[in-house]
A protein has these predicted regions:
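Conserved catalytic motifs of ABC-family nucleotide-binding domains
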Residues: 73
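Conserved H-loop
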Residues: 105-110
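Conserved ABC ATPase "signature" region
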Residues: 32-47
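Conserved ABC ATPase signature
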Residues: 52-56, 60
């Protein structure tokens, strides 16, 4: 299973369906215990899941994207600037959480934040002016 967290969370959710409908459409049934645990760790309130994407802030919606990815239990997680809508402290907390909860999952991180990449990566491939370094 492959999950992806996009840079712009508004483009990763359909605008006319609630967040929970879209998560269940991909993940299927979700245990309340598991859902509540992730909600707590991501500092999300359950009532936000029943709203449509445009009713949430960018940071809230990005954390919903992360929630969806966690609930998928992927073997590989592709993340494109996953913390772009989050402040620095929350961004590092979210990456710590992803690494901890997805212990047996490969994570491919695309980021402009070299400090973040150095902090959380085993291997870094840097692209600069179309050259691989």
């Amino acid at each position: 299973r492959i999950a992806m967290i996009f840079q712009d969370p508004y483009n990763s959710f359909h605008p006319t369906y609630s967040i929970i409908e879209q998560i269940k459409d991909i993940v299927g049934e979700i245990s309340s215990k598991e859902l509540n645990g992730y909600l707590s760790k991501l500092s999300l309130q359950k009532d936000l899941l029943y709203k449509k994407p445009h009713e949430l802030s960018g940071g809230q919606l990005q954390r919903c994207s992360i929630l969806r990815a966690l609930l998928m239990k992927p073997d590989l997680l592709l993340v494109d600037e996953p913390t772009s809508a989050l402040d620095n402290i929350i961004a590092y907390d979210v990456m710590k959480l992803l690494i901890k909860l997805l212990d047996n999952c490969g994570i491919l991180l695309i980021t402009h934040d070299l400090d973040m990449a150095k902090w959380c990566s085993d291997k870094i491939i840097r692209l600069e002016e179309n050259a691989r370094k």
